[in-house]
Amino acid sequence: MRSMTLFILFVSIIALLFLLINLVFAPHIPYQEKNSEFECGFHSFHQTRFPFDSPIAAQAICFVILDLEIFTMFPYVGSLGINTFYSLVVILGFMFVVSAGFVFELGKGALKIDSKQNMGGDSTHLELKNLKDISSLNLCPPSAFKN
C-alpha cells in the first residue's frame, strides 16, 4: 500500500506544479467583452448561432455505439488461447446482433447524409428499402475478380 500512497502523492504534486506554472506564465488580458455575461447582452463580433445538422449527430451516436461494441469484443480477442466453444457462440451471436442493427439502420436511411456534392440531380446516398436491395448494391465490380 506504501507504493500506492507514493504514487498518489507524486501525481498530486505534478498536478499542482502544472497548475502553478499555468497561473504564473499564462497571459492575463482582461477586457470588457471577456468579463461580461453572454446571456445578458453580449455583443458578439460575428454570428454565434449555427444550424445543427441532426443526421451528423445520429452518425456520431452510431460511431460511439460501434466503438463500445469493439471494446466489448477486446476481451475475447485477448484470450484467444483459452476460449471455449461457448465463448465463440456468444461472440458470434453478439456480432450477428451488431450486423443486424447495422442493416436496420441502413434500411431506415439513418446513415445517409445529404451533402452539397450529391444535391444535384443524381443522388448517391445509400438507402435500402428492403433486404433484396442489398444484392443490387454492386459493392465490388465483376472486373475485380478477373486475373
Curated annotation (Swiss-Prot):
Keywords: Electron transport, Membrane, Mitochondrion, NAD, Respiratory chain, Translocase, Transmembrane, Transmembrane helix, Transport, Ubiquinone. It catalyses: a ubiquinone + NADH + 5 H(+)(in) = a ubiquinol + NAD(+) + 4 H(+)(out). Its main location: mitochondrion. GO terms for cellular component: mitochondrial membrane; respiratory chain complex I. Its EC number is 7.1.1.2. The keyword Translocase applies. It is found in: Mitochondrion membrane. It comes from the Eukaryota. InterPro entries: NADH_UbQ/plastoQ_OxRdtase_su3, NDAH_ubi_oxred_su3_sf. It holds the Pfam family Oxidored_q4. The chain crosses the membrane at residues 6-26, 60-80, 84-104. Disulfide bonds: none annotated. Belongs to the complex I subunit 3 family. Core subunit of the mitochondrial membrane respiratory chain NADH dehydrogenase (Complex I) that is believed to belong to the minimal assembly required for catalysis. Complex I functions in the transfer of electrons from NADH to the respiratory chain. The immediate electron acceptor for the enzyme is believed to be ubiquinone. This is NADH-ubiquinone oxidoreductase chain 3. It comes from Neurospora crassa (strain ATCC 24698 / 74-OR23-1A / CBS 708.71 / DSM 1257 / FGSC 987). The gene is ndh-3.
